[in-house]
Amino acid sequence: MRPVGRRLRILVLSWNYPTGAAPQRGLWVQRMCDAAAQRADIIVLVPTPWVPPLFPLKAVARFRTIPQWERRGRTEIYFPRVPGSIEYFTHDFDARLALRNVLALARRLHAENSFDLIHAHFIYPDGVVASQIGQALNIPVMTSEHAFWTPWLNDRPRVGSQVDAALNGIKLVAPVSPFLHQNVAAYLRDRVEMTVLPNVVDDSVFFAAPRERDPNQLLYVGLIRRLKRVDVLIRALAEVRRTHPTMRLKIMSANAFRAYGQDRREVHDLVRTLGLESAIEIVAGSDPPAVAEAMRQCALVVVSSARETFCSVAAESLACGTPLVMTRCGGPEDFVTPADGVMVDVDNVHALAGGILEALGKRDDFDAADQQSRIVARFGREAWCDQAMAIYDRIATAYRCRN
């Protein structure tokens, strides 16, 4: 174990982290860092696209506004400029393009005050780069996994080969749910130790509080992309309104990636086609406190996804004491119970509409205090920090003993 009173020094590497240019991107990573910073020194490296002066495309030029360094609370954050890393245009090459600049910064920071552990988020490009930094600087590496490895790594063999080569330099892979653990384990085939380290629910923001709820308001929070099946939810709303004509839907969604622009246009077209303009409000780019307040004021939160690795929205909704109507989409099935809402099959408009009506019918039977206490006890900041620090201590201590 580390000496009594000495805080671990953790280097976090994540391409996904909130910035002024993309304030909703990587909120889950920021929450993990904020929670860990209660008991460890957290330094975050966020590889950031280098953009030349006077670049004409605003969607890319916005990255020039990101500072080189800043401190948020207890966390230090560096934004080293790297070639590429603009959405998915250079995806297959992003690890190789970024390594030189990120390694140089990590080497300098390590020389000033040595790190005990590198914690990367996503195996690629983050984990691949972290593996090479760890081997160069003799620091153990772990990754948190927030996305499915298959079919992704099989469909992109250039990425898959880089991941395979990096595994020897990674001590632990930590998917965010048992559901994702199964997917990643099938690819790893026992080549690296694994454990589950879930996402954090920020219980200082997402908590139950007395509010006058709107019994006719449904809430969806998340990206508008095909995997989220927002189209199924919109069609289900149209079906619900046949018997409940005052029912409305609020969609709170950040325009995080230009790649999903066509998906957003299709959703807007569907709303117009079904004549639901007055029943659906789409709000872009709300911050977490605004999302939490919307959760506290709505009747139900709806999760319509085909697949979810964890589903922070489901956990946050329950932390706010708001029941769910949710598809059987994997990750949240580990913590959502019949006492928390209604589960239905994926890609079934009629089933989703029926689930909404069923949950509305027993809305007063749900116990908000019980929902909140169960979620916070498992995923709140203190609970998460207990899990993370035990993992950090174990990896750092074992590595020191072997070296």
Please annotate each region the language model reported.
Residues 285, 293-298:
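Short alpha-helical donor nucleotide-sugar binding micro-motif in glycosyltransferases
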Residues 306:
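Aromatic "clamp/platform" in nucleotide-sugar-dependent glycosyltransferases that forms part
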Residues 11, 210-228, 234-237, 250:
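Conserved donor-binding/catalytic core segment of Leloir-type glycosyltransferases
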Residues 323-326:
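Short hydrophobic beta-strand element within catalytic cores of glycosyltransferases
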Residues 285, 338, 342-349, 358-364:
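Conserved acidic donor-binding segment of nucleotide-sugar-dependent glycosyltransferases
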Residues 264-286:
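Nucleotide-activated donor-binding/catalytic signature segment of Leloir-type glycosyltransferases, i.e.
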